[in-house]
């Protein structure tokens, strides 16, 4: 619930509160309600009190039990049972509804006016009958004594359809080209229609003759109002036997007594938007007038503002619940508005508990956020290395990105850059220190960025202040003190690159302009001194001197630009020669590709194992690699990541090495020493 106060009148917004994501399970919703106070305190007065896209009109039945609303897309009508606080039924329609009327006390008889000239009748069971009118309709009213429906629209005629006979009657011919709105007085049955020319025509249904004509367009123009176009009638409402309120497309509301052709009061919304609806509140003598931006409540006797209501979204229709302080709005948003104003009256019988709740659940307005989820785009996922999670339960697709659990996001963010929080903390501390320094007594010094430009501006400002002709010239704002250019002297991205080709070519012109400016200042000062001494001498200098001076400046500037261009061409030539020399000294070497560390290539035997490993989450893979000792993560000085993988031996290699080791030990153990054997010379005959 959101509470606002204007002129000490409290307005409770019952449809404002934290919205829960639709894809959350019931268990998570219950857990969120236990944990979050804002979610637990929100009030859902009527269940599913919304439209798929936009709500266009909203009305309450005469018995007060049913609330009917039309909207789009697809075009539909929804009926809500207030006694059950839920949706009773929903019916889809063939086209959008312009307006509708409830003919019975409940929802059993409804008439819809569509934007394709169709008139559709619905009974309690559903669709009953459909017919068409000759022109596009904009509004209609029901005359109970004669059972006639009066339709006005893009025609000068007012079409009459008798529901008792089931046929069209002779239309009423008005003097207007088109008619926008109409209404019937419930006391004496006077029929009034608002025209596109800004007039109101009143007709007697018994004689089918016009009995009055009001020129509201002329009366709506006051001394304070600014009118850019012809005001046309956009809203019309009777109250009692003698009072009528008229709303115009230029944002004025005129209050008339039927016995006079002059308005009793003219109220301007000051927005210049068409008045959409007008309602009377008899208990406090108030009038509720609404345009697409605001609902104003003002006294019909004095015109003094009582209070106003300004929703977040544009308004399409406003309905005041009978004999209560509840206000229903149809907005340019799926959710329909429910507002409770205790000063206007008590809460309706079906929600009498609001009187106690409004005293306990007052809270400040807060924006709707998803506290437990982080919204990330596809580019963010690529930077975090989480693109393989797309399609998994860890990511929920929403608009142009995904929702992910905030705990998982912080965990991955910490693994990608473990020192991000420390850097963020240091930046915040540095900003706080700079803010405290800025509050102290500041000395006149140059900014950190673009010092030369700032010095030039300061010198020019000082020269202007020293000169005596500054009084004749309109003072211009200084760039150094202008907030629009403040970033240019604080952000290093705006530093002027004096080594660039554009600056070097433009620099002679800038320097010559500054020299010319100084010379002109000196000449003007000398000229003013001469004028004081000799008043008869004419102002200025001879034209030939000016032309010679300008020609000399132009020649010097052209020579300087040519010189800078020659220097740039020489530098470019030297750079090309250096690049050519480097290319000649470069020796092409073969490029080798190695397998990832921690893996070995054994044909395609382990493809199933690798596939199973790749299907695991990033957290599980990191745990496995850290456990095996094949992965080590470290940070470099420039803020990037360095990953080191250790090649591990396979099980077959380990077994082979163990077998060789055992074989060597066994050979060593079974080996017999032959050190005791010595060679002896055999005796025999010597050869001669």
From Swiss-Prot:
Residue ranges the record marks as coiled coil: 423-446, 514-589, 640-673
Biased composition (Basic residues): 664-688
Compositionally skewed regions (Basic and acidic residues) per UniProt: 648-663
UniProt modified residues of type Phosphothreonine: 481
GO CC annotation terms, alphabetical: nucleolus; small-subunit processome
Classification via InterPro entries: Beta-prop_NOL10_N (IPR056551), NOL10/Enp2 (IPR040382), NOL10_2nd (IPR056550), NUC153 (IPR012580), WD40/YVTN_repeat-like_dom_sf (IPR015943), WD40_repeat_dom_sf (IPR036322), WD40_rpt (IPR001680)
UniProt KW Ribonucleoprotein keyword: no
Modified residues (Phosphoserine): 25, 475, 514
MF terms in GO: RNA binding
This protein's name: Nucleolar protein 10
Lineage: Eukaryota, Metazoa, Chordata, Craniata, Vertebrata
Gene name per UniProt: NOL10
């Amino acid at each position: 619930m959101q509470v606002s106060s204007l002129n000490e009148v409290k307005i409770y917004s019952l449809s404002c509160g934290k919205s829960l994501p639709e894809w959350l399970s019931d268990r998570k919703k219950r857990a969120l309600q236990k944990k979050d106070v804002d979610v637990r305190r929100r009030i859902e007065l009527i269940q599913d009190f919304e439209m798929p896209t936009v709500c266009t009109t909203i009305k309450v039945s005469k018995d007060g039990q049913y609330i009917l609303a039309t909207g789009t897309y697809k075009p539909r009508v929804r009926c809500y049972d207030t006694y059950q606080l839920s949706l009773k039924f929903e019916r889809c329609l063939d086209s959008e509804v312009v307006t509708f009327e409830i003919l019975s006390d409940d929802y059993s008889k409804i008439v819809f006016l569509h934007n394709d000239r169709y008139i559709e009748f619905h009974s309690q069971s559903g669709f009953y009958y459909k017919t068409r009118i000759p022109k596009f309709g904009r509004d209609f009213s029901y005359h109970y004594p004669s059972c006639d429906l009066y339709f006005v629209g893009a025609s000068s005629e007012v079409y009459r359809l008798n529901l008792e006979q089931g046929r069209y009657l002779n239309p009423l011919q008005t003097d207007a080209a088109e008619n926008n709105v109409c209404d019937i007085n419930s006391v004496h049955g006077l029929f009034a229609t608002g025209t596109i020319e800004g007039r109101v025509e009143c007709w007697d249904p018994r004689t089918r003759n016009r009995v009055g004509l009001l020129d509201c367009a002329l009366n709506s123009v006051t001394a304070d109002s600014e009118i850019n176009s012809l005001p046309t009638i956009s809203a019309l409402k009777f109250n009692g036997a003698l009072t009528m309120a008229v709303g115009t497309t230029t944002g004025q509301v005129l209050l008339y007594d039927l016995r006079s052709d002059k308005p009793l009061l003219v109220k301007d919304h000051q927005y210049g938007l068409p008045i959409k609806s007008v309602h009377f509140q008899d208990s406090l003598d108030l009038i509720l007038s609404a345009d697409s931006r605001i609902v104003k409540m003002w006294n019909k006797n004095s015109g003094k503002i009582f209070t106003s209501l300004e929703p977040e979204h544009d308004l399409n229709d406003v309905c005041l619940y009978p004999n209560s302080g509840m206000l229903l709005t149809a907005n340019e948003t799926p959710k329909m508005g429910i507002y409770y104003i205790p000063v206007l009256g008590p809460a309706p019988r079906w929600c009498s508990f609001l009187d106690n709740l409004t005293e306990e659940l007052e809270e400040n307005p807060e924006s709707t956020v998803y506290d437990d989820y982080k919204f990330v785009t596809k580019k963010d996922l690529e930077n975090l290395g989480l693109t393989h999670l797309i399609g998994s339960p860890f990511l929920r697709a929403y608009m142009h990105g995904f929702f992910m659990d905030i705990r998982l996001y912080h965990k991955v963010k910490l693994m990608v850059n473990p020192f991000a929080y420390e850097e963020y903390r240091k930046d915040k501390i540095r900003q706080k220190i700079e803010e405290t320094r800025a509050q102290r007594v500041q000395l006149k010094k140059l900014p950190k960025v673009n010092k030369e430009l700032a010095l030039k501006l300061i010198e020019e400002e000082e020269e202007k202040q020293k000169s005596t002709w500054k009084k004749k010239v309109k003072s211009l704002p200084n760039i150094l003190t202008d907030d629009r250019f403040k970033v240019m002297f604080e952000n290093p991205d705006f530093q002027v690159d004096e080594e660039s080709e554009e600056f070097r070519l433009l620099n002679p012109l800038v320097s010559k302009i500054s020299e010319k400016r100084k010379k002109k200042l000196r000449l003007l000062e000398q000229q003013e001194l001469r004028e004081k001494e000799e008043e008869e001498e004419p102002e200025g200098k001879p034209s030939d001197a000016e032309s010679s001076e300008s020609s000399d400046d132009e020649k010097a500037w052209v020579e300087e630009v040519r010189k800078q261009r020659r220097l740039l061409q020489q530098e470019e030539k030297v750079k090309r020669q250096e690049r050519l020399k480097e290319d000649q000294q470069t020796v092409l070497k073969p490029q080798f590709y190695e397998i990832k560390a921690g893996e070995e290539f054994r044909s395609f035997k382990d493809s199933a194992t690798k596939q199973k490993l790749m299907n695991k989450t990033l957290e599980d893979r990191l745990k496995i690699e850290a456990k095996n000792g094949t992965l080590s993560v470290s940070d470099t000085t420039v803020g990037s990541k360095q990953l080191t993988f250790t090649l591990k031996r396979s099980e077959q290699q380990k077994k082979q090495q163990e077998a060789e080791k055992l074989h060597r030990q066994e050979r060593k153990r079974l080996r017999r020493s032959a050190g005791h054997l010595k060679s002896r010379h055999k005796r025999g005959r010597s050869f001669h």
